[in-house]
Design a protein with these regions (language model features):
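Transmembrane-helix signature of polytopic, membrane-embedded enzymes
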Residues: 19-59, 94-101, 480-492, 544-554
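Membrane-interface transmembrane helices that cradle and orient dolichyl/undecaprenyl
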Residues: 27, 40-44, 83-102, 129-139
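Loop-to-helix entry region of an early transmembrane alpha helix in multi-pass inner-membrane enzymes
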Residues: 2-17, 21, 35, 39, ...
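Aromatic- and kink-enriched transmembrane "portal" helix at the membrane-lumen/periplasm boundary
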Residues: 2-5, 30-43, 53-77, 110-118, ...
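Signature aromatic-anchored transmembrane alpha helix within multi-pass, membrane-resident enzymes
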Residues: 153, 222-226, 477, 481, ...
Length: 581
């Protein structure tokens, strides 16, 4: 445990270092033309932007928690920061000989990061646009569209082809080697890996000889991704040793393929699929292979999911999880109430002593559809969420509660560290510390119980980090729109795009803010660049240039990381926290 914690802290420290270098690079791009000399005042301003932005991210709630947690997200954050900085290094040296070595290194790190977390792949669109902006002088809609398609193709190639299907093809080789040739398990996989790497190596050699630069870079990058991805071999080696903890036992290629394909988590619809109340019309089956006692692969067919009637398949199904309670979905969607007569179990209207019918408020939720299941009985009444209710759930729960709430935790303030089980005003909301704003949606903030008022997770930043980041965002948009779009790609892909992809259900077992750390990392770039805007404001107000303005701007903006550190210290300090206490 101590080594894991130490590694996470060290990885987090390097993440902050690479963030500092990234912010200073982007600040230099704003202050000077490429290749121009920096003045002393500019150097101080650049260092100030890096210090403020990097320290702000250091003390944000989400990153600080991940840095001291024995999980993969600290190392994942380091890989994210590293590949972005390396791509900016390439952009700086793109005209020099052998500058493509930076892209080759990025490809290797991408492959290596797959063994940590696939979240790092979401940096690909930003990296592609860095390449596009560096290689073209005139930005066009066609160029932007092509770059977007290329980045999507790279994501699909790595996530849907390299990660699962290289192992699957190797598993098919292993099936032939074991069942037909009588060779040991994994021998076919080893043969396939050697053959694949050899073929790619030959391709790299011949494309280099013939001067096919682009194809050579593609093949070399693919080779580097696979070499980095080979770190997953340790999973199979460890599983083959049969340790006490051996989840899914990926000791052969087919078991490893199932693990990489995330079969243990089941399927969830993304853009098209059923709602939680959709009836089933049958089972989905798939063939799986396992090793029998004779060391041969056997094939069995297992149930992998449910099939649903076509009329119950819809676009953008956000309320999809049949295991989640219907009431949980209702509380987060646009359900309404209407007045109706109270009825008993026989459907008769209930009346009072004077014979007047009782009226009650009932939920008005969903769309009612009659479905004949072919059993010969009366059609079933299926209550489906409407598209409007789906969108309301998406904006209210998935976007607001599961992303923007976390965003505001980090840059506005946090009410408590108690996870809310519903949309209640006493637990887990954002809190600014500005009384009249907080009372607009949380009610009176006076005379609060001790468990709320003295909760260590109650941190208030008075909107200061948020405002400085917003200033930096607008400043970069006006002064350097190309690099602004790159940071925005990071912010959106590591944030809102993940919200759409994860399609979360109500009542998650834990808070999921750590997933969006990359998005908060991007916003801290804007916090750092906000120092330049404050510096320009001081120069405009005093009519004086020189060292005074950048020094004053840095000192003033240091309030942001200062308040983050001061407010978050008590709930993130791990001193004397042991298993026995």
């Amino acid at each position: 445990p101590h080594m894991v914690n130490a590694m996470n802290c060290l990885a987090s420290a390097f993440c902050i270092l690479f963030l500092f270098w990234t912010i200073t690079h982007l600040a230099r791009r704003i202050l000077t033309r490429q290749g121009a000399e920096l003045t002393k005042a500019n150097i101080v301003a650049v260092l100030g932007t890096g210090a403020v932005g990097a320290l702000a991210y250091t003390f944000t709630d989400t990153f600080w928690f991940s840095a001291i947690e024995g999980e993969v997200y600290a190392l994942s954050s380091m890989f994210t920061a590293l590949v972005v900085w390396l791509m900016l290094k390439w952009e700086e040296q793109a005209d020099q000989p052998h500058s493509m070595r930076w892209i080759v290194l990025i490809a290797y790190l991408m492959g290596l990061s797959i063994g940590v977390h696939i979240l790092n792949l979401l940096t690909v669109p930003a990296l592609v646009f860095i390449y596009y902006f560096r290689k073209t002088q005139r930005i066009t809609f066609k160029g932007i569209a092509v770059s977007t398609l290329i980045s999507g193709a790279i994501l699909v190639f790595i996530n849907s082809i390299i990660i699962p299907h290289t192992v699957y093809i190797g598993a098919l080789f292993d099936l032939f080697f074991v069942n037909s040739l009588g060779l040991p398990v994994n021998s076919g996989l080893v043969f396939f890996v050697v053959a694949l790497l050899g073929a790619l190596g030959m391709g790299v050699y011949f494309t280099h000889k013939k001067g096919r630069t682009v194809l050579n870079l593609v093949l070399l990058s693919t080779l580097m991704i696979l070499i980095g991805y080979s770190s997953y071999a340790s999973v199979t080696i460890r599983a083959a040793a049969n340790p006490p903890m051996n989840s899914n036992n990926p000791s052969n290629p087919f078991a490893l393929y199932s693990l990489l394909n995330r079969d243990q988590y089941g399927d969830k619809p993304l853009l098209y699929g059923p709602q939680f109340s959709a009836p089933t019309s049958g089972y989905k089956y798939k063939d799986v292979r396992y090793l029998d006692d004779d060391g041969k692969y056997k094939t069995v067919s297992i149930i992998s999911g449910y099939e649903h009637p076509d009329e119950f398949m819809h676009l953008f199904p956000r309320m999809w999880n049949y295991a989640a309670s219907k009431e949980s979905y209702k509380s987060w969607s646009a359900y309404r109430t209407r007045t109706d007569y109270e009825r008993d179990e026989n459907g008769e209207i209930v009346r009072d002593a004077q014979g007047r019918p009782n009226k009650i408020e009932v939920l008005d939720f969903g769309r009612r559809t009659l479905w004949d299941d072919g059993s010969g009985y009366e059609p079933l009444v299926i209550v489906e969420p409407t598209f409007r209710e789906n969108l309301n759930y998406f904006f209210t729960y998935q976007l607001n509660h599961m992303y923007w709430r976390y965003f505001l935790w980090n840059f506005v303030g946090r009410q408590s560290d108690i996870q809310p089980t519903d949309a209640i005003i006493t637990d887990g909301n954002w809190l600014s510390g500005i009384k009249w704003i907080d009372e607009l949606y949380l009610g009176p903030q006076d005379n609060l119980p001790d468990e709320i008022a003295n909760n260590k997770g109650r941190n208030t930043y008075y909107f200061l980090p948020f405002l400085l980041g917003l200033i930096g965002l607008i400043y970069q948009l006006n002064r350097d729109p190309r690099n602004f779009s790159i940071v925005m790609w990071l912010f959106v892909m590591m944030g809102i795009a993940l919200v759409v992809y994860f399609n979360t259900s109500p009542n998650e077992p834990r808070e999921r803010d750590y997933v969006y750390a990359g998005s908060f990392y991007a916003f801290c770039i804007w916090i750092g660049l906000g120092v330049l805007a404050v510096c320009d404001l001081i120069v405009w107000a005093t009519r004086r240039k020189g060292l005074m303005a950048p020094i004053a701007a840095t000192v003033v903006c240091m309030v942001v990381p200062g308040i983050l550190a001061a407010q978050n210290w008590d709930d993130h300090d791990r001193s004397h926290r042991t298993m026995a206490r």
